[in-house]
Amino acid sequence: MNNQSFKNSLSLKVILKQRKRNRLLLIFLCFFIVVIAISLIMYAMRNMVSFFRTPSEITKEDILIGRPLRLGGFVEKGTVEYIGKMKVTFFVTDNAKHKKVVFIGILPDLFREGQGVVVEGYFDKQGLFVGKRVLAKHDETYMSKETADHLNKHHTVEK
């Protein structure tokens, strides 16, 4: 009988080890599936993410890729040009560099030269920023503190 209890004890230990191994395998598998799912979601959304950049922060890759992004800074004085009723061109500057923007649509009421602006759009093949949406700003709500400090160091916002 002693031999029988030893066998039962041994088989119980084997069963417990198998369960523990299976549990660890299940936890690892769940973790792996979650990591893969998050990676796929991030990969699928990479073109939908709209980054905020000042003209100085724009890279050649931003221009070549033509991905959606946000261009922020101030509307450069003397650059707003209306072409027809709905088309307007202007330069967005951070006082170090500037980028030309082409926008077709109705501008917000707060839009004016010297005022802060964020333009959502993309760069076309000629390097012009094609705006799809213009957000005129009356403060630094749309930008990080570092970006606002950089812009305000060289520019006084008109109120």
Swiss-Prot record:
Which HAMAP family does the entry mention? Answer: CcmE
Q: Which InterPro entries match?
A: CcmE (IPR004329), CcmE-like_sf (IPR036127), NA-bd_OB-fold (IPR012340)
- Organism name: Bartonella quintana (strain Toulouse)
Q: What is this protein called?
A: Cytochrome c-type biogenesis protein CcmE
Alphabetically sorted, this entry's keywords are: Cell inner membrane, Cell membrane, Cytochrome c-type biogenesis, Heme, Iron, Membrane, Metal-binding, Signal-anchor, Transmembrane, Transmembrane helix
Its localization reads: Cell inner membrane
| Function (record text) | Heme chaperone required for the biogenesis of c-type cytochromes. Transiently binds heme delivered by CcmC and transfers the heme to apo-cytochromes in a process facilitated by CcmF and CcmH.
PANTHER family cross-referenced by the UniProt entry: CYTOCHROME C-TYPE BIOGENESIS PROTEIN CCME HOMOLOG, MITOCHONDRIAL
